[in-house]
Regions:
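Short, solvent-exposed recognition patches
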Residues: 14, 18-84, 92-93
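Soluble, non-membrane globular domain cores that form compact, hydrophobic packing
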Residues: 2-18, 60-61, 113-117, 121-133
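A short, solvent-exposed beta-edge/loop patch
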Residues: 69-133
Length: 133
């Protein structure tokens, strides 16, 4: 999953920078999450598991309402968008992925890229590991 050693290796390769710590994953209210910490910031990966399409779409749309949406389509999963703070939300089957980049510097990675691009790279990496993504 998003916090497993395989995901950590893939995300490190994608961003070109190794985290100083990946927190122990938590599972609360059907949300699996962990934080990737770096010397100059961090991001949180979380996946909410839902029971059906209606619940999944409502949860996904709730993020859009709370976090806002930058213009432009994102071709990931069954729907995706970049929030106004550069975080990324992806809906796939009955799961919603949030890559919360709000605690990263505006430019992050090696080579440095806009934090929203870093979030998109992480989301694409995670989606490539999900069966049928």
């Amino acid at each position: 999953m998003v916090c497993a050693p395989e995901a950590q290796r893939e995300i490190t390769a994608t961003l070109g920078i190794t985290p100083t710590l990946v927190t122990v994953p938590t599972w609360t209210d059907h949300v699996y999450s962990c934080t990737y910490q770096y010397p100059d910031g961090s991001f949180v990966l979380s996946v909410k598991e839902l029971d059906n399409v209606k619940e999944t779409v409502a949860y996904y749309d709730g993020y859009r309402a709370r976090l806002g949406e930058r213009p432009g389509p994102i071709a990931l999963g069954n729907g995706a968008f970049v929030t106004t703070d550069g975080s990324v939300v992806v809906r796939k089957d009955f799961k919603v992925l949030l890559v919360d980049t709000s605690h990263l510097p505006l430019r992050f990675g090696a080579p440095p890229q806009d934090r929203s691009d870093a979030g998109l790279s992480v989301a694409a990496t995670v989606m490539s590991c999900w069966t049928g993504a």
